[in-house]
């Protein structure tokens, strides 16, 4: 089990629970035994030593089960299973639980410092867990409704005094929220067959991705957790077509990238009269959110520049809550944005 001590494994585990998990209440809960489950992508900070003894195939996600019980005459005790193995049994100083509004049934839980129990307490076995896989955190309309639309005239004020981490070339993280470009609502009817979120980075991937289904940048295989479902099946493919991490390998590696697929989508960037002239996309990476015309443009066969037309794409700032959940879903986002506690 996790060892105690300030800065020790026990404290690191507590910080992991507070900083990288959002919870769902298990239907197996009772008035005497409360059970919550969480799943999160592999952490760059907390790396549990399960020695290969966890559930097979669970390498791309961490599944946590928390059991709270209150023995007669004693404080609330807690036990935690990680990928099927008992990792911690303790007495938390406090446990604060808050319901997240919405249909997903999510909970925020804060754990105070863990103490060793004065006397052993009976630890129930972990109940069987299952959940629908690939549960979507937000649909398109919810993304628009819960995010802040940043007008071009307000861009300077919105980014002033903030330090940003660039994710790929088209997403930015300020320590609390993600900033990214999203297709304007008026144009969503132009692409009804696209199931993915209509972020600019996703569009670029659809235009330039390679054919290797195992390519992580293009297809995101084995790096995503089923956060909204509360449990990641060990046999799942770990793919997400909605994650902000998605950007093709070609776009990540080069500043000038040929358009190889779905060329009709270019009309949503350059307009119906000029999109057919565009053969390549040119990136001008920015360390912070900027005008869309300043970070990406089209290039014709003769080398002429074509600007992205105004009004088609909106700069959004995702809410802090959903930014947090999005971060939990993805190994790449964690690796780039969550370096320590």
UniProtKB/Swiss-Prot annotation:
This is Cytoplasmic envelopment protein 2. The keyword Translocase does not apply. Plays a critical role in cytoplasmic virus egress. Participates in the final step of tegumentation and envelope acquisition within the host cytoplasm by directly interacting with the capsid. Upon virion binding to target cell, a signaling cascade is triggered to disrupt the interaction with the capsid, thereby preparing capsid uncoating. Belongs to the herpesviridae cytoplasmic envelopment protein 2 family. GO terms for cellular component: host cell cytoplasm; host cell nucleus; viral tegument. HAMAP family: HSV_CEP2 (MF_04039). The gene is 33. Interacts with cytoplasmic envelopment protein 3 and with the capsid.
